Amino acid sequence: MSLSNEQVGRIARLARLAISEGEIDAVRAKLDGIFGLIEQMQAVDTAGVEPMSHPQELATRLRDDVVTETDRRSAFQSVAPQTEAGLYLVPKVIE
């Protein structure tokens, strides 16, 4: 697929790109290369190929779900102004 200068200009306007007349040929060549690659990919027969999310079937390595932090509630509540039964007491702000 080969693009014309008008088509390249239209694509540039739609993409809000400022392309000078001297740059159109270089941009057209790059776009032609991209569209050529797309045509090659579309020509591949994928009938019977099952869709996949990743190219390789690998399991995600996860760490063991173990507690890594000790319970420090008493240390945190020791510096609080008021606590009761493991809860923080705060002044009433809504009447």
Curated annotation (Swiss-Prot):
Keyword Calcium carried by entry: no
Which molecular function GO terms apply here? asparaginyl-tRNA synthase (glutamine-hydrolyzing) activity; ATP binding; glutaminyl-tRNA synthase (glutamine-hydrolyzing) activity
Pfam families reported for this sequence: GatC
Its top-level enzyme class, in one word, is ligase
Q: EC number(s) in its UniProt entry?
A: 6.3.5.-
UniProt cross-references to Gene3D superfamilies, sorted A to Z:
Glu-tRNAGln amidotransferase C subunit, N-terminal domain (1.10.20.60)
Chain ranges passing through the membrane: none
* Entry's Gene Ontology BP terms: glutaminyl-tRNAGln biosynthesis via transamidation; regulation of translational fidelity; translation
Give the reaction(s) catalysed. L-glutamyl-tRNA(Gln) + L-glutamine + ATP + H2O = L-glutaminyl-tRNA(Gln) + L-glutamate + ADP + phosphate + H(+); L-aspartyl-tRNA(Asn) + L-glutamine + ATP + H2O = L-asparaginyl-tRNA(Asn) + L-glutamate + ADP + phosphate + 2 H(+)
What are the record keywords, sorted?
ATP-binding, Ligase, Nucleotide-binding, Protein biosynthesis
Q: How does it assemble?
A: Heterotrimer of A, B and C subunits.
Q: Which PANTHER family match?
A: GLUTAMYL-TRNA(GLN) AMIDOTRANSFERASE SUBUNIT C, MITOCHONDRIAL
- Which family does the record assign? Belongs to the GatC family.
Provide the function of this protein.
Answer: Allows the formation of correctly charged Asn-tRNA(Asn) or Gln-tRNA(Gln) through the transamidation of misacylated Asp-tRNA(Asn) or Glu-tRNA(Gln) in organisms which lack either or both of asparaginyl-tRNA or glutaminyl-tRNA synthetases. The reaction takes place in the presence of glutamine and ATP through an activated phospho-Asp-tRNA(Asn) or phospho-Glu-tRNA(Gln).
Q: What is this protein called?
A: Aspartyl/glutamyl-tRNA(Asn/Gln) amidotransferase subunit C
Per the UniProt record, the source organism is Azoarcus sp. (strain BH72)
Q: Which lineage do the record's taxonomy fields give for this organism?
A: Bacteria, Pseudomonadati, Pseudomonadota, Betaproteobacteria, Rhodocyclales
